[in-house]
Amino acid sequence: MRRRLARDGILVVVLDQAGNPQVHGYGLPLDEDYDAFVAEAEADIGKALGRLKGAQARDREAVMEAARLAARRAAQRWSGKKPQTKVIMAGEA
């Protein structure tokens, strides 16, 4: 895993209690474009969470997986890498 982290980087997605995302990336080759990438990734996560309906929207695991996939897909579009992605929800230890 250590080599994969060094090669592909890592994304950390933090969802507050209202479901607003914050994205932090480490080791991604996006020096000049980092701020634009973060803005697009956060927008993509918001759209993905908005598509969840009914029981899925209330299921913590489904919300975390939708956010993880949206952030990872944005990173792949921008950098060509598939970083390890961790989602942390407010109130989670």
Regions found by a protein language model. Give the residues of each.
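Acidic/His-rich, metal-assisted hydrolase cores and their charged scaffolds
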Residues: M1-A93
